[in-house]
Amino acid sequence: MLKKSLVVLLSMTTLASCGGGNSETQTPIESGFAMCSVPDQNAVFFEFLQNTYLWYDQLPASIDPEAYNSVNAMLDDVRFEQDRFSGFSEKQAFDDFFENATFVGFGFSSDSASDPNAYIVRYVFGGSAAEQAGLARGDRLTNINGFSIAQIADQQLSNETVFGPNEEGFTIAVTFTKPDNTVVNTQMSKSAVGTNTVFATQVIPSNAGSVGYLSFQNGFIEPSDDELIAAFAELATQNVDELILDLRYNPGGRVSVAGNLASFISGSVADGEVFTTLEYNDKNADRDFTVSFSDRINALDLTRVVILTTSSTCSASELIINGLAPHMDVVTVGSATCGKPVGQSPDEYCDMVLSAINFRTVNSLGEGDYFDGLPATCSVEDQIVADWGSLDDPVLAAAVDYLNTGSCGLQAAGKSLLSITPPPKLHYQALLTEHLH
């Protein structure tokens, strides 16, 4: 089964990572092992790495393909120490995320780190079982199928033990508390979840004029373009003067989607100018290419944008910040981003997809290499206490306050260390797969 070129990605979820553009077909070597056996895959994928890996000169000269019991073990052994982003996924899982935008589950993402007694809901996919059960951002899950959240942590229960197998129809009982302290007891059943990436589009009145708010999470994927077209049509109709773009939980994805989003924001301000350049290793310098801002119907023609960030703001999301910065005033509110100024052009072989780092990204000024993340202009701790667009959200409230006053204000005071402390060096796959149910 020959490898075929897939999309170029800047990020991933369960799977791939970030990138975007020009791909070339590589022909797998004849490894001498049974086709698609583990040693064969190890040999073929290592050969791909030797050719296209950004840090190919840091690889060992050769490997013993029989020394590893999986392609993941091989990659973990040979990867460059700075690389926490390259990874493998099964092709079906890759396609489900980037192309089909589906998974089997209840349809929500949660944060389990900020409260020992609750899973706090980050976002809920439209039309999912979670939405039908009344779950929304800011709700606190306190009991899942008879397990308290403290029990889950104390007993180190697996995701499958708590939420069940990834099978349609599997049902659990849940208890959750709304922000107004209403307690809900209900059931949810797993189904095929169609994932959306635009979670809210609205207008917030302010002293700075009409402020558009766009919550864009969960990736820069195939359906995103149509969602963004609809969102910016709505914002343009409202004649917004400013934009707050919420990228707090967006791990990235297609460079092409990032280019379209940036063009919607800047419009005539940067039309035809360089958004980003993808630079491959010296063996593949002929694959370097530049993505420019393009003319978009309903573009906002802004000279300033405020972007909400966390350490889960990654890859293509960071590309938006870095790519817009030479052309307009970019204000970030929240905390430092994840630090992924590199991307992948995935390679497929034997129904496995290798998303290895192939290129770095730089803006029109040649700026990149932000492996410690992009610092926040105004540092504010992310607290999930309300639904999208609510000014009870301290990060959104700080962003609106910045537009009203031109400064970070008291809410962000005393938190400046957040802007210079690098985010945790989580492996990228862990960052993208955690807490999606």
Where are the language model's segments positioned?
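C-terminal motif of bacterial Sec signal peptides marking the signal peptidase cleavage site
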Residues: 15-17
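C-terminal "post-core" interaction segments
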Residues: 211-214, 218, 226-230, 234-242, ...
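P-loop NTPase catalytic core of nucleic-acid-dependent motor ATPases
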Residues: 245
